[in-house]
Amino acid sequence: MTGTGSPDEYTLAELKAMRLRNGAGIKTRHQIPTFEEVMNLCKGKIMVNVDKGYDYFKDAYEVLKKTGTVDQCIMKASLPYEQVKAENGEVLDKMIFMPVVQLHKESAEATIDGYLEHMKPQAFELVFNNDSPEVQRLIKKVRDSGAKIFINSLWPELCGGHDDDRAVELHQPDESWGWIIDQGAKLIQTDRPALLLQYLKEKKLHE
């Protein structure tokens, strides 16, 4: 069976009895996995980007510690350093945390400076709805700090119009993925992984 409504209306056993639907709305054979099950499956294989996990930051850390995957999971939030530190204390220093900064907002540079001053993140996820000189200046500032740059190319508002559809449907990969790479991005979130990989190989950027 499949379900409707909010997950918190069901017990775990009830959720486990359900099956996920595919993109066309058809029931599949797949169950809803727990976070612990996912991390056990991924252990020693890949990095996991937890997109909606900030509200469960400390709970997530306990699961990561239990499964031995603390170094394989990236937690993130669109919040200033002071708030994240106040809400999570020493746990923040034990996990890989990636700030999400919306570069088109007035608070962007202050948010970047706060993290660079206090914790030197390994990476920043940079979100921007335009590619103005000011946005590019802030991208350069993050790049020059030594932190890796994560850019999401799923839709235009996340990457200043340099999105997946521009690469694939408009046949402009250089203006999409190429532009993102030229900004220094080392991490790209895409719905077209095979095509992006092909592009990287053609540009001699991937073996």
Predicted regions and their residues:
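Metal-dependent phosphodiesterase/phospholipase catalytic core, i.e.
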Residues: M1-L103, L126-N129, R143-S145
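C-terminal active-site rim and adjoining tail of enzyme catalytic domains
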Residues: G25-R29, E106-E207
